[in-house]
Amino acid sequence: MLKEFREFAMKGNVVDLAVAVIIGAAFGAIVSSMVADVIMPIIGAVTGGLDFSNYFTGLSKTVTATNLADAKKQGAVLAWGNFLTLTLNFLIVAFVLFMVVRFMSKLKRKDEAAPAAPPKPTREEELLTEIRDLLKTKK
């Protein structure tokens, strides 16, 4: 049973999938940092210093806090600013992945665009062709 598991785990698809998951997680962290540390501050500067992740709407009268962390302690809140930030994060990840897939597709098409020259006929095929031609002329 251990041997079967080892054979399964070492198949190309399983190993490729594991590598893809690890790279995907690292890529997600990079994009999250790009959104939180680069894009959102720029958007905040353009909109007058707004930090969308701290926007919320209290769902009860007991919520009087002005920041999200304290408001969550006071009661139920609708953290729509955080949702907006995560949605923007998703859109950026999706766009970057789209660009990567598009680039890879272009490379693949470029490789496919140059078809390989047909292989030269083997000596055996040449002889058979000559024999065929001789038989045709004898008829």
UniProtKB/Swiss-Prot annotation:
Compartment(s): Cell inner membrane
Protein name (Swiss-Prot/TrEMBL): Large-conductance mechanosensitive channel
Organism the protein comes from: Nitrobacter hamburgensis (strain DSM 10229 / NCIMB 13809 / X14)
UniProt xrefs under InterPro entries: Mechanosensitive_channel_CS (IPR019823), MS_channel (IPR001185), MSC/AndL (IPR037673), MscL_channel (IPR036019)
GO terms of molecular function: mechanosensitive monoatomic ion channel activity
Family annotation (HAMAP family): MscL (MF_00115)
Key words, A-Z: Cell inner membrane, Cell membrane, Ion channel, Ion transport, Membrane, Transmembrane, Transmembrane helix, Transport
Membrane is among the record's keywords: yes
Transmembrane segments: 19-39, 81-101
Pfam families: MscL
Subunit structure: Homopentamer.
UniProt membrane topology term: Multi-pass membrane protein
PROSITE patterns in the record: MSCL
GO cellular component, one term: plasma membrane
Summary of the function given for this chain in its UniProt record: Channel that opens in response to stretch forces in the membrane lipid bilayer. May participate in the regulation of osmotic pressure changes within the cell.
Protein family (similarity comment): Belongs to the MscL family.
